[in-house]
Each structure stands twice: as structure tokens, then as C-alpha cells.
Amino acid sequence: MCLVEVKPGPPKPQASCALPATDGQEIRTDSEMVKTAREGVMEFLLINHPLDCPICDQGGECDLQDQSVAYGRGATRYEENKRAVTEKYMGPLIKTVMTRCIHCTRCVRFSEEIAGVDEIGALYRGEDMQITTYLEQAAEHELSANVIDLCPVGALTSRPYAFEARPWELKKTLSIDVSDAVGSNIRLDSRGREVMRALPRINDDVNEEWISDKTRYQVDGLSKRRLDKVFMRKRGKLQPASWDEAFKAIAKAKPGNSIAAIAGDMVDCETMFAAKTLLKACGSSLIEGRQTGMDYDVSNLAAVNFNSTFAGIETADAILIVGSHIRWEAPLVNVRIRKAVKRGARVFVVGPQWDTTYPAEFLGEDLGGLLLHLAEVLVHLLRRSRHPDVVDALLRF
């Protein structure tokens, strides 16, 4: 679709994405030659593509659908048999209809280059090429469902969201992910009072264009298998009950000061008042507020100005990870660290072993061993490195 007509130049369309700019060029993007060439490219893309738009979950937000409307022919000239392949299993999150695949290899390149996990690859060559996982096992890494957003057709779609709704039926609400401390920018799509799905929003300073699988699929907990009513065990079985019955049963089973409440420093006043009223009704006065130490100090701007940004992690030349399984606790920070390693950064980890997606030196968790090696690492980080970074366990929420 990037073909253009260039004058002066060869008498055939040129790929503008690979064409160097020179003085005096005349670029035509809507000439008859360009239209004919784009129609030919689109016709080749659609040769083996099934006419599944009415039943495809990608319908309404499909790149191939949009490009076909904009640049394609009104009718096909292909009368031969179309290619068909067997379905591939990629796990409980990714639904596959690989007959729709156009072999763009976006999913393969994402898994290898961004996630750093070689789980998705290509078999065979040419028209016979097929995209699949290793031995048709599930794609299990923490960013696997991003291939759903990358797929320009309906070959890879969301299995939990299959046949649930169409894009034009949904209300879009901009939001922030709270499943970890990264604060990824997301968009929540809802129909009525039900949240149907969560999708990433582009923010190059935070999550770029990715989200973790936990962020994407935690919305299921809002409507499925949710404890939205009181249950009491009667005769060995859980049965629905009212709140009054539940509170009376609690007060009877644990009267007086055998019941206590502990509230954190993030609880609002209304909730604290309700908790105090509940304990008073149960005959208890044991209520306490615990300070977690997670409050943010705003008295000194140095705590903000001297810290690295998420994007700044990519420019670090030495990184020390302290007590954090960063790949699972903050997958998008792990992506940034992987980029830094590609640029030559060294990574040191204080804590137990875990499977990284880049070379890292584990210093262990034994205090004796740390006393021997930690000083050397700190010297390397603070003296020899120009842009050191320290990532600690506070990335957990």
C-alpha cells in the first residue's frame, strides 16, 4: 500500500517506505498507475483470505478490511481453490483462525524482539508457511496477548472475548491500570454496565503500546465468578443470605473483643466510619490504623527530579534489581530493561533466581555472599557507569 509514482524515475511504482528522498523529486500518490498497483497488491493479499468478515471478531477494527475498502477492487478475479490450514493451539487467551493469516509475521517479531521469548515462529516456506507455537504449546509469557492487537486480520483474536460484542456497540473510556505500579494507559470498552475488555493506549513515556496479560484479562473478575452477595453455609452447603443474617451470625460466633479491624492509610473516611460502626455493633472496640510507609513524600522535589523515568531506563548502562521478580511484577519495565541490555547495559540481581529475557548476573540472596560481591557491584554501578539505575521491590503494588 506504500507504492507511489516517482518522476523522474523508473516507469514502475516505487515502495515509498524504502525510497530515499532526493532534490527535485515529484511524488504522485493517487495516479492511475498507483491505484492499479495497489489494487494488484491487495488482490494478492486476498487470494487466500476467506470471506469471514460477518463472523470474525476483528470485523469493524480490521486493518485488512479498511485497506481493502480504500484500495481494493470491487470484485475478485480468483477462481481457484483457496489455501486452508489446520487450527493452531496458542493457549486459553489467544484464539486462532490461521486460514485468515496473511504472513505478516508481526506476532513472531513481537515475541522475539520485544518480549524476548521464542514461543511463536513460522514453519515451511512461501504459500505453505504457517504461524504456530513451539510444538503447538500455549504461549505462556506475560505479554503474549499483545499479538492480538498486532494482528492486522482476524487470525489471532481474544479467546475470552470471542463473539461477545462488536466495536461499534461499545462505549470507550480512558483509564489507568492499577494491577501494578507502572500505571499503564488503557482503554476500557463497556456495554451497558458491563466492562467487556481492556485495550492498551499509546504512551511512549509509560507503557509504549503494550499491556500485560494480567492488565488485559483482570476485567473478567468484574462480572465472572464475583462474590457479589452474601453466602452462609447451612447443612453443609453455601446458600444466599442477607447482610443482616450474616452480621448476626458473625456477632454470635465471635462476640465482643474477639473481633478486630485493621485499616491501612489508603482507606477513605466513610469506610473507616462504617468499619467502626460495624465493630461497635459487634461489641468490639479493637480498631487500629496501620501506616504502610507507602505514602509519597512531596516535601522535597529531589525525590522526583533525581529519579529515572521509565523511558530513561533504556539509556542506563548498568542496572541493579533488588528483591524484585521484575518480569512478573512489572512486565513493561522488564521490556525497558531488555532494550537497555541490547544497547550494552549490564544487569545485576539481588534475590532468588528467576527466568530473565536477557543476560543478567544473579548475586544471590545469601547475606554472606552479598557482602562479598555487593560492594564490587556498587563500585561498578556508581563509579564506572554514567547512567546507573536501581530497581527495587517497590514496583509491586
Whereabouts are the PLM-identified features?
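Fe-S ferredoxin-like electron-transfer domains
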Residues: 3-177, 182-186, 192-194
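Generic alpha-helix structural propensity
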Residues: 1, 12, 22, 36-37, ...
